[in-house]
Regions:
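Short coil-to-beta transition motif at edge beta-strands of beta-rich domains
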Residues: 25-42
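Structural alpha-beta junctions
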Residues: 30, 61-62
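Contiguous surface segments at macromolecular interaction interfaces
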Residues: 64-150
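Compositionally biased, intrinsically disordered low-complexity segments
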Residues: 8-9, 59, 128, 148
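N-terminal "first-domain core" detector
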Residues: 1-30
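Beta-sheet entry/capping signal
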Residues: 3, 34-36, 53
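Single-stranded nucleic-acid-binding OB-fold domains
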Residues: 44-46
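Short beta-strand-centered aromatic/proline hotspots
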Residues: 48-60
Length: 150
């Protein structure tokens, strides 16, 4: 499996999260400081692995080419933008999945497809999630991408 975000590097999309759905525009209006990214591990429908946390910025990446109707920009070089390096263990997948399933049950039932995969996390949920993952190993986002590219 290709490491997360490698296709973004290859297509010049680092620093951009986009979607054609209006749900992303609604989320952008809430002025988020951070975006969390997750994947469903292969063969583990209904489970989530946290991949990264990116610091939101108003600045477009220098090489930004619009691909979607709505975009969020993140600062890939910020020390606050990280990739989680040990979040793939069964225990951590279960921790993340249980925490979020209790709060976003409908999204889990739809397996996070389409708009159901985009959710605002209220401050109390963010604080709890940050506490949950605070001891997970991380690497600065761009350093992690460089490692993934070899």
């Amino acid at each position: 499996m290709k490491p997360p975000f490698v296709s973004d590097v290859n297509e010049g999309r680092i620093g951009t999260l986009g979607a054609d759905t209006d749900k992303l525009a609604e989320l952008r209006e809430r002025l988020p400081r951070k975006v969390w990214t997750f994947i469903t591990p292969k063969g583990m429908k209904g489970k989530l692995k946290v991949i990264g946390s990116m610091w939101i910025t108003d600045e477009r990446p220098a090489n930004f080419v619009p691909k979607w109707r709505h975009n969020l920009f993140y600062d890939a070089a910020s020390p606050k933008s990280v990739l989680f390096t040990n979040s793939g263990s069964p225990e951590k997948i279960e921790e993340v999945s249980s925490y979020l399933n209790n709060r976003f049950n409908q999204a889990f039932r739809s397996n996070f497809h389409g708009e159901k995969g985009l959710h605002a996390m209220e401050a109390d949920i963010v604080r709890g999630f940050e506490k949950l993952v605070r001891d997970y190993e991380t690497v600065q986002f761009m350093e992690g991408i460089k490692e993934a590219l070899g």
